[in-house]
Amino acid sequence: QILLTQSPAIMSASPGQKVTMTCSASSSVSYMHWYQQKSGTSPKRWIYDTSKLASGVPARFXGSGSATSYSLTITSMQAEDAATYYCQQWSSNPLTFGSGTKLEXKR
């Protein structure tokens, strides 16, 4: 199965700061998908097919990458972006998730 490694595990950002988190796959995948999860809620699909934003996701989010290296970027951090973000692949069975990047907001 394909192992997804997310980095960093935990990070913090101030309002307006650019944020980048990465997801590294142990083998090449065609696309990467990202989910956002806030405490006490179910994960929400956030970015799919590497770079497409799910409905309602703000344009400050961007996804990019190919093969084994993918990233999620927030061009200008907002307080409501604080959450845990998970990458996911289904190019190869079984479907696998990364262990998450927890993004905290600095005041």
Swiss-Prot record:
Pfam families, A to Z: V-set (PF07686)
A GO cellular component annotation in the UniProt record: immunoglobulin complex
Stretch list, region Complementarity-determining-3: 88-96
Renumbered residue ranges of the record's region Complementarity-determining-1: 24-33
GO biological process, one term: immune response
Superkingdom per UniProt: Eukaryota
Keyword Coiled coil set for record: no
PROSITE patterns in the record: IG_LIKE
Segments of this protein annotated with the region Complementarity-determining-2: 49-55
Disulfide bonds: 23-87
Official protein name in the record: Ig kappa chain V-VI region NQ5-78.2.6
UniProt lineage: Eukaryota, Metazoa, Chordata, Craniata, Vertebrata
